[in-house]
Regions:
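Short, solvent-exposed alpha-helical "recognition" segments
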Residues: 37-41, 67-68
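Short, charged recognition helix plus adjacent turn
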Residues: 30, 48, 56-74
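Short basic helix-loop element that most often maps to the first helix and adjoining turn
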Residues: 1-20, 45, 71-73
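DNA major-groove recognition helix of helix-turn-helix/homeodomain DNA-binding modules
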Residues: 22, 41-56
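Acidic-residue sensor for enzyme active/binding pockets
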Residues: 14-15, 32, 54-56
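Recognition helix of helix-turn-helix/homeodomain-like DNA-binding domains
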Residues: 23-38
Length: 74
């Protein structure tokens, strides 16, 4: 599942996540689009916030980055 879908399933906006984690909205957007990986210190808080496992967050983040790499390489 994509990070954006996980966030939306949790009923959260990017702004909500940014505020809870004390990061910029652009950081959350970049994570979801695969522009930047999620720093390890945010994996557990994101998982708790979204109500999923850390493994699911890592998998979604990796998939976003792989998709981005595929687009950039095309």
């Amino acid at each position: 599942m994509e990070l954006k879908a996980i966030r939306e399933n949790a009923g959260l906006r990017q702004e909500d996540v940014a505020k809870k984690l004390r990061v910029r909205v652009s950081a959350v957007s970049n994570w979801e689009r695969g522009v930047n990986g999620i720093a390890s210190k945010y994996i557990r808080p994101l998982a708790r916030l979204y109500g999923v496992t850390e493994t699911e967050i890592r998998a979604a983040s990796g998939a976003a980055q792989a998709a981005r790499a595929g687009k950039d390489g095309a």
